[in-house]
Amino acid sequence: MAKKIIGFIKLQIPAGKANPSPPVGPALGQRGLNIMEFCKAFNAQTQSMEPGLPIPVVITAFADKSFTFIMKTPPATIMIKKAAKIEKGSPRPHTDKVGKITRAQAEEIAKAKMPDLTAADMDAAVRTIAGSARSMGITVEGL
């Protein structure tokens, strides 16, 4: 028989920097999961990634206090900001433009995000990324 699931925990944790302090400790502690075991496993799996890059993770907690976790791709907004070489998006995105990305950069981001996107094909994924960029005040050239 399969293990009984008691809940899902969704967190965004910097790659290679999971530690028992908030938000990780309290979220896992209230479900009775081993916090250090998760931190070691997460840090081991993210050591090849860029340190500090926020990684969304979904932790499945089971009744016997065990857990599994699935890591997603970094948020599109982080990748877009990196491609446009800016610190943050525009406070007024439709009037103040803060940067530019090309269609090729949008395609590269869409390719990386494809497993997590609901887009039917690559063109739809590129349009999704372009929409996110526009909502941040970044112009997408060639689209």
Swiss-Prot record:
GO terms for molecular function: large ribosomal subunit rRNA binding; structural constituent of ribosome. Disulfide bonds: none annotated. One or more lysine residues are methylated. InterPro entries: Ribosomal_uL11, Ribosomal_uL11_bac-typ, Ribosomal_uL11_C, Ribosomal_uL11_C_sf, Ribosomal_uL11_CS, Ribosomal_uL11_N, Ribosomal_uL11_N_sf. GO terms for cellular component: cytosolic large ribosomal subunit. Keywords: Methylation, Ribonucleoprotein, Ribosomal protein, RNA-binding, rRNA-binding. One of its GO terms (biological process) is translation. Gene3D superfamilies: Ribosomal protein L11, C-terminal domain, Ribosomal protein L11/L12, N-terminal domain. Forms part of the ribosomal stalk which helps the ribosome interact with GTP-bound translation factors. Belongs to the universal ribosomal protein uL11 family. PANTHER family: 60S RIBOSOMAL PROTEIN L12, LARGE RIBOSOMAL SUBUNIT PROTEIN UL11M. Part of the ribosomal stalk of the 50S ribosomal subunit. Interacts with L10 and the large rRNA to form the base of the stalk. L10 forms an elongated spine to which L12 dimers bind in a sequential fashion forming a multimeric L10(L12)X complex. This is Large ribosomal subunit protein uL11.
